[in-house]
Amino acid sequence: VGKPVAMLLLNGNATVTVCHSKTRDLPEVCRRADILVAAIGKAGMITPDFVKPGATVIDVGMNTITDPAEFKEFFAGNEKREHDFATKGSTLIGDVHPKVVEVAGAMTPVPGGVGPLTIAMLMSNTVKAAKLRRGEKVSSLAVR
């Protein structure tokens, strides 16, 4: 996820910094971002202290929580999530802690954020590819 997103942003003339879980002073580096894309693979790793107030946070992570204690750490007091967890015995969480919403200007949800957008773009590009195969003209296959 990291390299393709970085390339898309670079192609849009953004200044991009790519980090990983072992980046020194990761919270400090993240706090400089106007747009923070999290795809680190660890539930709730990006906490409010990683985020510049007003930043846009895009959470690409998909982690399943089955441990009730871990669930409470992230979702205590969230009645809808508590009901779903009690019913299913698990819940999805991204790489961004839910409390980041209190700091961020905008934040994608998990589930229901990046995943549906990815599916929509794949379908759009599939239709365009089929039209190209039939010799029809189409707009570019690039992500917009």
Segments from the language model and where they lie:
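Adenosine-phosphate binding glycine-rich loop
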Residues: 68-144
